[in-house]
Amino acid sequence: MKKYLAFSLIIVSLVIIVQNNLLYAQPSLRDPNLTVESFVSGISFPTSMLFLDENNILVLEKDGNVRLVSNGMLQAQPLVSLTVDTKNERGLLGAERVGESVFLYATVKDGEVINRIYKYTLAGAELTNEEVFMDLPGTPATNHQGGKLAVSNDGYLYSVTGELQRDGKDQNIVNGPDPDFSGAILKINPNDGSPAPNNPFQGGNPNDPLNWYQAYGI
């Protein structure tokens, strides 16, 4: 029994070492027509990028900082620093631009843990006029947060929130809780947060989360 336990521990240790080596290894290429080079360094746990123009890129750090890379140089000071919950898969997770507005998706504590979308005005390469755009569920789980934002061809904002291990009706759990904005792709009017008018599940109740759903079961 002792020999078996020792052997098992050795195998587990080797697996962890191999996984860590793969995680931090240099990228490898199988296409000889491609090359890999370092573009910028000094960023901590990047989660998303947003190209503002050909010279300026916003890079999100999981711990709440929005960093600006301008002409290939990482600027010393963050454009925005949010206080976020970084446990497991929580944190500053997504960014998107719609016109002259920039949206950020982050997990925050405001009485309870929630996923919050912030809206900013883009002024040059600065983010101004912070406002809370929309609050979404952030519990029960610390993983499966989602957090990605995108803009549709018709100018609406997409937001993805994971199911948070909630196991609701929108995950085909018959006796589960009703939809609550989790486990879904939302399509949102970027001006006022209302649901896009062509969303497929709109009903008579204006407060029904399904009005915002573009897809569910995420």
List the predicted regions and their residue ranges.
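Blade/loop signatures of beta-propeller domains
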Residues: L22-T35, L74, S194-N205
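Repeat-solenoid scaffold signature
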Residues: N207-I218
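Positively charged n-region of N-terminal signal peptides that target proteins for export
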Residues: M1-Y4
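Bacterial N-terminal signal peptides
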Residues: S8-I17
